[in-house]
Design a protein with these regions (language model features):
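A generic structural signal for residues embedded in beta-strands
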Residues: 99, 110, 150, 155-156
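Short alpha-helical interface elements
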Residues: 66, 90-91, 126, 133-135, ...
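Loop/turn positions that initiate beta-strands
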Residues: 94, 105, 145-153
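Short alpha-helix capping/helix-loop boundary micro-motifs
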Residues: 82-85, 137-149
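Short, basic/aromatic beta-hairpin or loop at an interaction surface
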Residues: 71-79, 122-136
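Electropositive, beta-rich accessory/interaction domains or terminal extensions
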Residues: 1-107, 112-113
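Active-site scaffold segments
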Residues: 107-112, 128-143
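Short, surface-exposed beta-strand-loop junctions and turns on beta-sheet-rich folds
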Residues: 116-117
Length: 156
């Protein structure tokens, strides 16, 4: 893939799973702010401080990349790395994508789609759940240690 410029518009790390149980009960509150200006990535483990970090069942899907296609607060989609100007959903399974926001490249192997859940119709306008089918992002495994920051990013 030829290098292209895009933007990291949001980075999210949450120590808890906010969308558990029935949507009618409302999301679980976050114990600390989840929006970050930078994140630490660890190869094979995920994002430091995130609920999926170093969980054996989630190592191949520890980080979720998402295209900023939903109007409103990208935090509500609960995806880790939100990109503008790059079609994350076009990445095929098994591909490797590198992101470099200024601290050196961090590679991710794409494993599977991040399917939306019914919570999307609770935290976004009704119909978002259906609209995000096939556009919910990609679950990835980090292949390198590194740092990613909000702002311009080279993708290759």
């Amino acid at each position: 893939m030829a290098a292209r410029r895009a933007l990291i518009v949001a980075l999210h790390v949450s120590s808890v799973h906010a969308y558990e149980g029935r949507p009618s009960s409302g999301p679980r509150p976050d114990p600390s702010p989840v929006s970050r200006d930078h994140v630490e990535v660890r190869a094979g483990l995920g994002l430091v401080g995130d609920r999926y970090f170093n969980h054996p069942a989630h190592r191949s899907a520890a980080v979720t990349l998402f295209s900023a296609s939903v109007p409103g607060d990208p935090l509500l989609a609960r995806r880790n790395i939100v990109l503008s100007g790059f079609d994350v959903d076009a990445l095929p399974r098994g591909s490797v994508v590198a992101l470099d926001s200024g601290d050196g490249p961090v590679r991710f192997e794409v494993h599977r789609p991040a399917n939306p859940c019914a919570w999307m119709d609770v935290v976004y306008p009704r119909g978002t759940f259906a609209a995000l089918r096939g556009r919910g992002g990609k679950r990835c495994e980090p292949l390198d240690d590194g740092v990613l920051r909000v702002g311009p990013v080279e993708i290759y």
